C-alpha cells in the first residue's frame, strides 16, 4: 500500500535480507513471481524497475566517498528516467536540509560526515530520483539510540509528507514499533503480518 512504513523482522538467518534483495530486484527468486503495481517484474524489466521505481539504503551507506553529500544527491538525480527539476542543486540542498544536513555539511566529502549524517545523505540519495519505494537494510544498525530515533522520524516523513512506501529490514524493536505494518519471518517462511 502506497505511503506506508513496513518492517521485516525475524531472527538472524530467517531470510529478511534475502526477501528484501528479491523484492528490490537485486536477487532472483527461485520460484514464484514478484509483482509491482499488478505487473510482473520480469515483464517490466529489472533495470527499469531499479532505475525508476526504487531507492535503496544500505547499512553501510554505500555513498561515493570522493563526492560531497550534495554531489551524491545530484548524481542520483541524473541516474533516472523520472522527471527531475532543472534546478537540481537547489533541490538537492533543500532535500538534504529537510533531513538535517545543513549546506556547510552538504558541501563536505561524505567521509568527513558522521555515521548518522552519512545515513541521512544515503536516504536523501534514495529518494532524489523521484522513486515510489524505499528499501532499507538495517539502516540504523550502526547508529546510537538518539540517531536511530532521528532516522525513524525521516522514514515517517518519507511516508507522511512525500507519500513514499518504505520497507525496512531491522532487528530493532524501536523501528518496528513505529512502523505501520510488521512482516515476521522465520527460517525463510512468512510467520505473521501485523
Per-region residue spans from a language model:
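Conserved ABC transporter NBD signature motif
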Residues: 32-40
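Conserved ABC ATPase signature
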Residues: 109-113, 117
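Helix-to-loop junction immediately C-terminal to a conserved catalytic motif
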Residues: 24
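Catalytic Walker B motif of ABC-type/P-loop ATPase nucleotide-binding domains
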Residues: 134-137
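Conserved catalytic motifs of ABC-family nucleotide-binding domains
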Residues: 130
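Conserved ABC ATPase "signature" region
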Residues: 86-104
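ABC ATPase NBD coupling module
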Residues: 41-55
Amino acid at each position: 500500500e502506497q505511503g506506508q512504513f513496513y518492517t521485516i523482522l525475524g531472527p538472524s538467518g530467517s531470510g529478511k535480507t534475502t526477501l528484501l534483495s528479491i523484492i528490490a530486484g537485486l536477487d532472483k527468486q527461485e520460484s514464484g513471481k514478484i509483482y509491482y503495481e499488478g505487473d510482473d517484474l520480469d515483464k517490466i524489466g529489472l533495470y527499469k524497475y531499479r532505475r525508476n521505481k526504487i531507492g535503496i539504503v544500505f547499512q553501510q551507506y554505500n555513498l561515493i566517498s570522493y563526492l560531497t553529500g550534495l554531489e551524491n544527491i545530484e548524481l542520483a538525480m541524473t541516474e533516472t528516467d523520472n522527471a527531475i527539476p532543472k534546478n537540481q542543486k537547489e533541490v538537492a540542498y533543500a532535500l538534504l536540509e529537510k533531513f538535517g544536513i545543513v549546506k556547510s555539511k552538504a558541501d563536505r566529502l561524505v567521509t568527513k560526515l558522521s555515521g548518522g549524517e552519512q545515513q541521512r545523505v544515503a536516504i536523501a540519495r534514495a529518494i532524489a530520483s523521484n522513486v515510489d519505494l524505499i528499501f532499507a537494510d538495517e539502516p540504523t544498525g550502526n547508529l546510537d539510540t538518539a540517531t536511530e530515533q532521528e532516522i525513524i522520524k525521516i522514514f515517517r516523513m518519507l511516508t507522511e509528507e512525500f507519500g513514499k512506501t518504505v520497507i525496512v529490514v531491522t532487528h530493532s524493536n524501536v523501528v518496528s514499533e513505529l512502523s505501520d505494518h510488521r512482516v515476521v519471518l522465520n527460517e525463510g517462511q512468512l510467520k505473521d503480518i501485523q
